[in-house]
Amino acid sequence: MSVKEYLSQAYRLDQRINSKLEQIKSLRDLAAKATFALSDVCVSGSKNKQQMENVIVKMIDLENEIDDDIDKLIDLKREIVSMIKQIKNPEYQTLLELRYLCFRTWEQIAVEMNYGIDNIFKLHQKALRSINISQTVQ
């Protein structure tokens, strides 16, 4: 795994968490519809109740997955912070933190650091080369 791939893991994990949060929202909307259907029907609604139970079980499973993913993300960010702290150059540290911990775009980083975008790309390559991933990642 390259340094860039390793550092990018946090962003990918954050995306998966956000995707699961959207899925939960969708399931909540579905559960609300099922609840509405239950209150509308005065006859035996065992099918609707079962549908509602299935939605709730799926929501709980997703929430547990999100909790696990958040724990992983926190641990991964700690590892990335530790890796970045080993770099002597503060500009490299700032750039890597903005990109891989704050998930800023290249344009945002260029503005925040008062550099042109081409200089940010060059600085990024130098920053990546300054990291020895073999010492940090097993």
Predicted regions and their residues:
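Short alpha-helical "recognition helix" segments of helix-turn-helix
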Residues: 108-111
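N-terminal interaction/assembly modules
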Residues: 1-86, 133-138
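Short amphipathic alpha helix immediately N-terminal
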Residues: 88-102
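N-terminal positioning helix adjacent to the helix-turn-helix/winged-helix DNA-binding module
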Residues: 76-79, 90-92, 123
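DNA major-groove recognition helices of helix-turn-helix
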Residues: 120-131
